[in-house]
Regions:
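Extended beta-strand/beta-hairpin segments
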Residues: 1-56, 67-165
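Alpha-helical metal-binding/catalytic segments enriched in His/Glu/Asp
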Residues: 61-62
């Protein structure tokens, strides 16, 4: 089933040097840019790479979704931590792929409110936009375009691909 877009989020990326890329978030004014970099030997490791950020996005979404459920259930959350491990392995063609993501959420709630935590444990993941989208597979469309020239010509499309989901 194809979903109609309700929201869209924009990220602008700019090459800084070699494998280092700066990401800006124009939808959130005042947000500092995020620097991505590949681990050595490709990059210098001066920032997280895309696999790390994917893990962080899933961990953040699960944390926020759990908090939303607990708040709605009137559970007093004293603390919440999350640990995410993103595993990378080679596929059958020898190319690196994300082979799994493990998330451990550790909420601290008073013993008297454990029943609310247990109720949320059953349902909260279904409401996590990022995690459930990754689990289902996300349609990704990629286009490769030559930038506009200095004389004002419009960018020239080179190629476009889309994965079937």
């Amino acid at each position: 089933m194809f979903m109609s877009d309700l929201h869209s989020h924009h990220v602008n990326l700019r090459l800084v040097t070699k494998y280092r890329v700066s990401a800006e978030f124009p939808d959130v004014p005042g947000t500092p840019s995020l620097l991505f970099d590949e681990r050595p030997p490709l990059g210098d490791g001066r920032g997280p790479n895309a696999a790390m950020v994917l893990g962080a996005a899933i961990g953040d979404c699960l944390s926020a979704t759990l908090m939303n459920c607990l708040i709605r259930a009137h559970v007093d959350v004293e603390a919440l931590t999350a640990t995410v491990v993103t595993r990378v392995a080679r596929n059958h063609a020898g190319r690196f792929r994300i082979s799994g993501i493990e998330v451990e959420l550790c909420p601290t709630v008073p013993p008297s409110e454990r029943a609310g935590l247990e109720r949320c444990q059953v349902i909260f993941q279904d409401y996590c936009t990022v995690t459930e989208s990754v689990r289902e597979g996300i349609r990704v469309t990629v286009s490769l375009t030559q930038p506009a020239s200095d004389n004002g010509n419009v960018g020239t499309p080179v190629a476009a691909t889309e994965n079937p989901v």
